[in-house]
Amino acid sequence: PVGTPTAVVQIIHGLGEHSRRYLHMISALLDAGFVVIADDHAGHGRTAMQSGVWADAGDNAAEVVISDELTLQQQLAGQFDDLPWVVFGHSWGSMIARAMATRPGTRLDGLALCGIVAQPRGFETTLDHKTLAKAMA
């Protein structure tokens, strides 16, 4: 970021996307003083291009991606303990972000959701609506 960082923004992209799709947003956030963290989900981005398999993180894709995003937080959290942590999720990424918000130990001081989608079949057990409502209150 330019100057002293003010917060961390973790970007979680949607299904079939990749983190580079958000370069314009990443650039604006960096210019505004934010630390930006963005990765590609399993089966997305460069990995998918090289393997030819798109948007496939396996049979338990949601849990795989949630686990990956939480691992990313854990790996980087020590570097940014003094900064607020905002999770931004777009489309399927908004579902991942909402699920993360219900998990104990998730680093979350702010939640920004874009292109919010409904909860599809199979995602019911991932979200705890009472905990999510409490986290967002």
Language-model regions: role of each:
Residues 1-5:
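Short beta-strand-to-loop junctions in surface cap/lid or active-site-entrance loops
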Residues 12, 39-41, 114:
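Alpha/beta-hydrolase
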Residues 14-17:
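Active-site glycine-rich loops that stabilize anionic/oxyanionic intermediates
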Residues 19-23, 46-49:
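Short N-terminal helix/helix-N-cap motif within the alpha/beta-hydrolase-1
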Residues 28-52:
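Conserved alpha/beta-hydrolase
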Residues 57-78:
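Alpha/beta-hydrolase active-site loop
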Residues 80-91:
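Alpha/beta-hydrolase fold nucleophile elbow
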Residues 96-137:
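Alpha/beta-hydrolase-fold enzymes
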